[in-house]
């Protein structure tokens, strides 16, 4: 079965249970421990849930930022500061986002970026949603890159092109896969 079909069949229970384990694994990584500023996506649809991760980031005193799609034609995004007082608004794709006037966090200040995916492989290649927002954003940062993916959505091999940025790690409920 193709990834899209598998993804649609994922139950909320499976996603919730896998997300809890994945969050625990992320919080135990060296990348998390070292990070002062973390950019984390807000989950949408069948993505690994991130609300517990964001809560822990705040509890651990880390500076949290989330993506804001600033140009849907050119597929450009920025990192915006996210606090427990930030009022989110529905974005261009129905994903909750910070308001456009929220403080921008420069890419070079971000230590860790937690990315969503449609699928990943064990070589730490990521298949995104196809718009290329992260592919355009990631070259501007030296942050550690970790994608969260349920094991059921892992692929044997993700095709890559010159614009794809390899990840440092992929975390599933079963393992942490590292590049190299």
Task: Label the model's feature ranges.
Residues 1-109:
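N-terminal active-site beta-alpha-beta segment that forms phosphate/nucleotide-binding
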Residues 72-180:
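Conserved phosphate- and dinucleotide-binding cores of soluble alpha/beta proteins
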């Amino acid at each position: 079965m193709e990834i899209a079909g598998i993804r649609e069949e994922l139950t909320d229970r499976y996603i919730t249970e896998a997300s809890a384990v994945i969050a625990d694994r992320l919080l135990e990584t060296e990348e998390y421990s070292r990070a002062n500023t973390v950019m984390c996506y807000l989950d949408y649809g069948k993505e690994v849930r991130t609300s517990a991760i964001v809560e822990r980031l705040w509890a651990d005193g880390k500076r949290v930022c989330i993506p804001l799609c600033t140009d849907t034609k050119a597929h450009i995004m920025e990192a915006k500061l996210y606090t427990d007082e930030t009022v989110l608004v529905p974005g261009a794709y129905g994903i909750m986002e910070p308001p456009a006037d929220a403080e921008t966090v420069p890419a070079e200040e971000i230590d860790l970026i937690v990315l969503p995916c449609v699928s990943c492989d064990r070589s730490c290649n990521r298949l995104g949603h196809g718009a290329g927002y992260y592919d355009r954003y990631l070259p501007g940062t030296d942050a550690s890159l970790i994608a969260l993916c349920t094991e059921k959505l892992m692929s044997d091999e993700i095709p890559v092109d010159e614009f794809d940025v390899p990840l440092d790690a992929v975390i599933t409920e079963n393992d942490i896969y590292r590049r190299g």
